């Protein structure tokens, strides 16, 4: 697959379940969101189980179940997988107008479990989304010489009840680098879950996402310093 292993799964949930999940999202302006608002990203997220309404709680439980992980194994052929019950980096995600997420590599080591993060599952949950607003996940190839993203290869359009599952260990650059242009009051809603494998001995440990600057940011020293500071800060937490 180009640029790395990924699977797009439409009609992921029964449509009535998908609609109910979308309706259970908190209001975007509710104060308990964690707001990532910096030169690299503009999104809100929540991953606390105690805040999930009943159906959302049940769905995250199912997506982390042995039964569902067996389904993931059948789709991907990856045999050794563990759930991330703590939803580290997962849970609810929301983007408003102007929301974005620079192209990046996910962290590859779960800091609590010391397992390799192997697969990322994202399900889009905004009905009646116009794809001209953006919001589709972009998958980019890897430039071996610069060790940076090379070019956009795939855009997985933000279509209601569509899931994308992808391998995060293959220099899997991805993101939403172009600010979303949806109307005010419309939001890109998604849920995310990650699956892990045993840690290979030769793994280059990265416990925090590694971001790349956009083309417009490539010569912006403040942005480049911010990217370095994120990595340095995390390395001090080991």
Mark where each language-model region is:
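Signature of the catalytic double-stranded beta-helix
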Residues: 20, 24, 44-89
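Short beta-strand segments
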Residues: 8-10, 91, 120-122, 165, ...
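Acidic, glycine-rich loop-and-strand cores that form catalytic or ligand-binding grooves
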Residues: 83-84, 90-94, 116-117, 128-129
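Histidine-centered active-site/metal-ligand motif
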Residues: 6, 104, 174
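N-terminal auxiliary "cap/dimerization" subdomain that precedes the catalytic jelly-roll/cupin core
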Residues: 1-42, 66, 217-238
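Catalytic core of Fe(II)/2-oxoglutarate
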Residues: 98-99, 109-117, 127-238
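PAPS-dependent sulfotransferase catalytic core
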Residues: 43-55, 121, 189-196
